[in-house]
Amino acid sequence: MSERLLRPRATSTVFEALERGAALVALESSVLAQGLEPPYNREAARRMTEAVTAVGAIPVITAISRGTPTLGLDDEDLERFLQRDGVRKVSARDLGIAMADGADGATTVAATLALCALGGLEVFATGGIGGVHRDAPFDESADLIELSRTPVIVVCAGAKSILDLPATLERLETLGVPVVGCGTDELPGFFSLSTGLRLTSRLDRPEQIARAWRAHRALGRESAMLVVQPPPADVAIPADIVDAATRAALQAASLAGIRGAAVTPYLLAQIQQRTEGRSVSANLALLEANARLAGQIAVALVEGTP
């Protein structure tokens, strides 16, 4: 017996925008509830939503709000997520359980992709995707498999720097996920400008990316398209500094027995400490830049630029 697919709840602004075919950009909530500590999470929410709005698109923060898959958080709901108390980290596999429990769930990249597919959103901005973990190739983020089967444009600064970036890029190729550089010929290093990992595709204008996406979909491709751009140069951190901080953070996590979903927030906090806060400045700036580019792509899609 087949079940009718659920339609996420949307705020009135998002619902009206969907009805008229306006440009929308999905934003994950996990970076706000687990990735960045207060007050930085509040600043991230403001900068990302303002960046999307400034280019003529509508920001849509995704979440499970008291058990309901939600597109767009009103002020009261957003404040609850920014306070972080009792908010779960929810990946795609956890969505149904969070709904059954009536829980507040902050959506990861994988879960946000799933909600985008249900809600009809084609563009999503985040900081960095998950991938293959260093020294543990069996530990692979659910983001990768979700990217392989969910047709959404994902704008990011590459995979998080704590990961095995060469292995992650190889997995994306195996899974049939196109990776397109915007303003770069290399995979960015999240906090760093480059990694030395060459990309096979580069498109520097939102209109070009929109055309490539339409062609991708016209061919019946069901995967996401990953659009990667480096962090702003004025806040980027040299790769050797990031690598040293990451290795020290991984060692600290191992000694502390950190496991599972707690690993990434722990490592990012350790890197923040070891870079004397530079990683937070870079994270905020790249989140804003990615939101802006995603908004420009969403507008280009709606305008149907030839």
From Swiss-Prot:
One GO cellular component term noted in the UniProt record for this chain: cytoplasm
Binding positions for Mn(2+) per the UniProt entry: 139
Binding site for substrate: 89, 109, 141-143
Cofactor dependency: Mn(2+)
A GO term, aspect molecular function: pseudouridylate synthase activity
Complexes and interactors: Homotrimer.
Similarity comment: Belongs to the pseudouridine-5'-phosphate glycosidase family.
Protein name: Pseudouridine-5'-phosphate glycosidase
